[in-house]
């Protein structure tokens, strides 16, 4: 990304650990609840915060981690089921040699890591807890969450103990960066205070159901400034199913790197009209530009090409193919491409419309592969 474009983004995205359904096996049950009926959500109605905390607080845990590389650290988590599975963030347990959890009752239990997925910042740990200790939370539907709805965040900020903060859903469908720099789609943005140690704790709606896993903030100062993000619970559901079943997560992959700025944004940044971009540089009116194609990857096999680079009003821009449509949906940015790929699975066939600069659109079909560990 050029300095011109990179300079437009000044906030830091900070991962906040703290330093210093049925899964198919027949023996694991995850509590889920249907979305509220139309008119039930978005009006601020629902149980008071104290009631939500009383209902859900016992299912939230502190996660304590020790490693020779990073020393002691920690975060939060919540009980998923009565078999002892606990959800937290991957960055909380990354590199951990010893993991333990502290329940709200004060009971401490050793935990083992079942699996981690850096691409979604989700990890699953497991405890062998005594009967009556585990109080699973109920999972909601993050796709039904609306801007303005009240939310409650519970966790262990700054290691002071399980605490509650409140706010609203400030935005939905936000793309955020995972620990491995992949994009997590559809994050829930909130102004509920999220501080070091909150990572891995639940973001709950007014009914006390989990709609996200608190993960990071955007900040220019390094402290909380009212912009926090939670991994959407629908993404978490898919990940934990795979972790429980196989201990790993498989992601779709087509083998392209995309220029972060879409054609529409490029026009705004350069001061050129879309017509000028078309006449002078052969670019279509909308789309996402391919900067690189992985050798031997699905996109290369389908005939999609990356390219060199040329300057447009001082901004270095790739000269690769432009993706204008995927699966019948218009594409306007790299995030649109990422969202389609993230929602696919290996073996799926994706129909794309691509344009090489100065040429007519063409249709290609890409067979989704398995994302390599080093991709």
Segments (PLM) and residue ranges:
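Extended hydrophobic-aromatic, low-complexity segments
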Residues: 267, 300-302, 309-314, 361-364, ...
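Serine-dependent protease modules
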Residues: 1-11, 15-279, 283-286, 295, ...
């Amino acid at each position: 990304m050029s300095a011109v474009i990179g300079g437009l983004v000044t906030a830091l995205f900070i991962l906040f650990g703290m330093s210093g359904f049925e899964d198919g096996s027949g023996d694991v049950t995850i509590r889920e609840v249907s979305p509220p009926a139309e008119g039930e959500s978005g009006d601020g109605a629902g149980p008071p915060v104290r009631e939500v905390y009383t209902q859900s607080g016992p299912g939230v845990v502190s996660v304590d981690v020790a490693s020779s590389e990073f020393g002691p650290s920690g975060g939060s988590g919540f009980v998923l089921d009565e078999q002892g599975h606990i959800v937290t963030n991957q960055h909380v347990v990354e590199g951990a040699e010893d993991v333990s959890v502290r329940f709200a009752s004060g009971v401490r239990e050793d935990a083992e890591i079942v699996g981690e997925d850096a691409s979604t910042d989700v990890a699953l740990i497991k405890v062998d807890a005594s009967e009556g200790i585990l109080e699973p939370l109920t999972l909601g539907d993050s796709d039904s969450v609306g801007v303005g709805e009240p939310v409650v965040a519970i966790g262990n900020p700054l290691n002071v103990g399980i605490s509650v903060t409140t706010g609203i859903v400030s935005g939905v469908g936000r793309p955020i960066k995972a620990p491995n720099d992949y994009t997590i789609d559809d994050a829930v943005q909130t102004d509920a205070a999220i501080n070091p140690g909150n990572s891995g704790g639940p973001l709950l709606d007014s009914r006390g159901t989990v709609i996200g896993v608190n993960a990071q903030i955007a900040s220019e100062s390094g402290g909380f400034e009212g912009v926090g993000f939670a991994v959407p619970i629908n993404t978490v559901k898919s990940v934990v199913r795979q972790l429980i079943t196989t201990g790993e997560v498989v992601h779709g992959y087509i083998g392209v790197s995309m220029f972060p700025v879409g054609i529409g944004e490029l026009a705004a940044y350069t001061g050129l009209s879309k017509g000028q971009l078309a006449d002078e540089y052969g670019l279509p009116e909308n789309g996402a530009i391919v900067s690189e194609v992985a050798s031997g990857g699905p996109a290369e096999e389908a005939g999609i090409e990356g390219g060199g680079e040329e300057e447009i009003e001082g901004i270095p821009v790739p000269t690769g193919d432009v993706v204008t449509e995927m699966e019948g949906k218009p594409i306007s940015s790299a995030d649109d491409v990422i969202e389609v790929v993230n929602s696919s699975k290996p073996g799926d066939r994706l129909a794309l419309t691509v344009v090489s600069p100065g040429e007519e659109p063409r249709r290609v079909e890409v067979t989704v592969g398995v994302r390599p560990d080093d991709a």
